[in-house]
Design a protein with these regions (language model features):
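Polyanion/phosphate-binding surface patch
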Residues: 45, 49-81, 124
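Acidic, His- and aromatic-enriched active-site or binding-groove loops in soluble protein domains
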Residues: 67-76, 185-206
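Residue-level "edge-of-site" marker
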Residues: 50, 169, 193
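Single conserved hydrophobic/aromatic residue that forms the stacking wall/gate
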Residues: 354-363
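Auxiliary tRNA-acceptor-end handling modules of aminoacyl-tRNA synthetases
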Residues: 2-23
Length: 363
């Protein structure tokens, strides 16, 4: 091979090799996470890297004209197959296919790679490992969701974090849905509203960024424009006022919609159960947490660090949520035609390798 034809040793954007200490740390973290999954009663599940595209669903991407745009898909004879975007959709397919052989309350954990066909960044990869824990079946929902919160706390404490170093934020999607119903926001705008609210705590957004997304459009620092929900000034103002509420008591006094009140009551039930554990201090209400994926139906959880993280290059980075999830009522009904409730969480294992660097004091 002559000099002009030599290959350039490189990887596609959003993919990386992992070796040496970083890989050792990752494996150590996964042992801690898996130990806690087993302690909380789950059994392992492994599904193929590929699923039929229809199994993954059309509720993923923010591009409403092309909802599967964030999914890597390929034509395989007369079918479209996709690399799995998350571990929840394969779980729904597996449960629908095998539920007769599974216990009535099925707890499973899965630790596998997922793939996202989206813009990569320093802390955002297009292939990464997720570690999921889910509970499916007719279990008491407050009990199941409280168990998820306890599992998150137990795992993070075992990893080496202190209670004051992380916050488990919880909410209920019914709360904001009730407000949306009261404001008579049309169906075609509702998903954009929910995704706008979910951006509040993301870097570079804040109330102004959310307001732009609730109205005509938002232009970011690069000049890229995101289409807004095109709400009226009054509708946008009501939502922004809602986002300023921080506690259940005030929320209960201000939101009278029956669906909102139902969501508030469900959150109160979760806190009542958590009160019997030793983990209550780490768990807070945050009504701006709604999660962008359409399949979430009520309970929502998102866990964030209370300190800045330094990466291997010595640079402070925002790694975002380190564990998130929630309840879903219709994910399995796409296959079974019957609503089978489920709830679950996902740890992003790559994020935790930042935590265990010497600069962050956990090794």
């Amino acid at each position: 091979m002559n000099k002009e034809n030599k290959l350039n040793p490189s990887l596609p954007s959003g993919f990386e090799d992992r070796w040496g200490k970083k890989l050792v740390l990752k494996k150590q973290l996964l042992k801690v996470i898996e130990k806690n999954f087993i302690k909380f009663g789950a059994e392992p599940l492994e599904t193929p890297s590929f699923e039929y595209a229809d199994n993954i669903g059309s509720f993923l991407a923010e591009d409403e004209d092309n909802p599967m745009s964030d999914v890597f898909s390929f034509e395989d004879r007369d079918k479209t197959i996709s690399l799995k975007y998350d571990l929840s959709s394969p779980l729904a397919r597996f449960y629908a296919q095998n539920n007769q052989a599974l216990p009535s309350i099925y707890k499973r954990y899965a630790i596998q790679n997922v793939f996202r066909n989206e813009k990569a960044s320093n802390a955002r990869y297009r292939e990464f490992l997720q570690a999921d824990f889910d509970i499916i079946g007719n279990v008491n929902s407050a009990q199941a969701n409280a168990e998820l919160c306890n599992l998150i706390s137990s795992t993070l404490l075992d990893i080496g974090l202190n209670k004051d170093q992380f916050t488990i934020n919880v909410s209920n999607r019914k709360i904001v849905q009730g407000l949306i119903n009261d404001l008579k926001i049309s169906d075609d705008k509702q998903l954009r509203v929910i995704r706008a609210i979910d951006k509040l705590d993301k870097p570079g957004f804040g109330l102004k960024g959310v307001e732009d997304l609730l109205k005509k459009e938002r232009k970011d620092v690069s000049g890229a424009v995101t289409k807004g929900a095109d709400l009226t000034d009054e509708q946008a103002s009501q939502i922004l006022n809602f986002l300023k509420i921080k506690d259940l008591k005030t929320l209960k006094e201000n939101l009278k919609n029956p669906l909102s009140q139902e969501g508030i009551k469900e959150l109160e039930d979760v806190f009542e159960i958590i009160g019997f554990s030793s983990y209550l201090s780490e768990i807070k209400t945050n009504f701006t947490i709604v999660r962008g994926l359409q399949y979430y139906s009520d309970f929502i959880v998102e866990t964030n660090l209370n300190f800045k993280v330094t990466n291997i290059k010595g640079k402070e980075v925002d790694i975002g949520s380190i564990c998130s999830g929630g309840a879903y009522a219709k994910l399995i009904s796409r296959f079974k035609g019957v609503d089978i409730p489920g709830t679950g969480i996902s740890f992003g294992a790559v994020s935790y390798t930042h935590l265990t660097l010497p600069t962050n004091g956990l090794v």
